[in-house]
């Protein structure tokens, strides 16, 4: 990483021994080791995360391409089938149905005529009940015994 050779490392150790002294050198070496270890872990985490993101992006791109290819094939197939069906449409449908439908003509809003002073509007008709059919159906108010329910 830094390309430090043995000679450079030995020179750094001697300078540290002279500056820090023999009492503080082990503590400083441990702290330096922790810093270097933390830096290595951060670099490895960063590179692994970067690799994961690149792989995920490549996978997304492949999925996009695969999805586009699949949709294009389906679209071509459907368009081909529709074009072929239009060729034979005149054989299946009568002549008046093969033409494209025209839009409906615009209609005016029709208001019902207002009843004149002498005329009364008819009340709505109620359905007429057949009394014979009504008598066949039991009413809720008729007394029934518990044995009737199970027979």
Swiss-Prot record:
* Compositionally biased spans, kind Basic and acidic residues: 87-99, 122-132
Is the keyword Transit peptide assigned to this protein?
no
Q: Is-annotated flag, keyword Coiled coil?
A: no
Annotated membrane topology is: Single-pass membrane protein
Feature: compositional bias, Low complexity: 134-151
Q: How does it assemble?
A: The Tat system comprises two distinct complexes: a TatABC complex, containing multiple copies of TatA, TatB and TatC subunits, and a separate TatA complex, containing only TatA subunits. Substrates initially bind to the TatABC complex, which probably triggers association of the separate TatA complex to form the active translocon.
Job of this protein: Part of the twin-arginine translocation (Tat) system that transports large folded proteins containing a characteristic twin-arginine motif in their signal peptide across membranes. Together with TatC, TatB is part of a receptor directly interacting with Tat signal peptides. TatB may form an oligomeric binding site that transiently accommodates folded Tat precursor proteins before their translocation.
Q: What is this protein called?
A: Sec-independent protein translocase protein TatB
Query: Which organism was this protein described from?
Result: Marinobacter nauticus (strain ATCC 700491 / DSM 11845 / VT8) (Marinobacter aquaeolei)
Give the gene symbol.
tatB
């Amino acid at each position: 990483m830094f390309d430090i050779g043995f000679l450079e490392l030995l020179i750094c150790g001697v300078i540290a021994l002279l500056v820090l002294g023999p009492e503080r050198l082990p503590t400083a070496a441990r702290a330096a080791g922790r810093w270097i270890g933390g830096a290595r872990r951060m670099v490895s985490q960063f590179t692994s995360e970067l690799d994961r993101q690149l792989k995920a992006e490549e996978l997304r791109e492949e999925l996009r391409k695969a999805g586009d290819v699949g949709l294009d094939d389906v679209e071509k197939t459907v368009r081909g089938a529709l074009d072929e069906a239009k060729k034979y449409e005149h054989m299946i449908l009568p002549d008046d149905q093969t033409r494209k439908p025209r839009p409906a003509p615009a209609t005016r809003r029709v208001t019902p005529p207002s009843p004149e002073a002498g005329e009364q509007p008819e009340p709505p008709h109620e359905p007429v009940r057949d009394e014979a059919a009504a008598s066949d159906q039991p009413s809720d108010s008729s007394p029934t015994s518990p044995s009737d329910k199970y027979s």
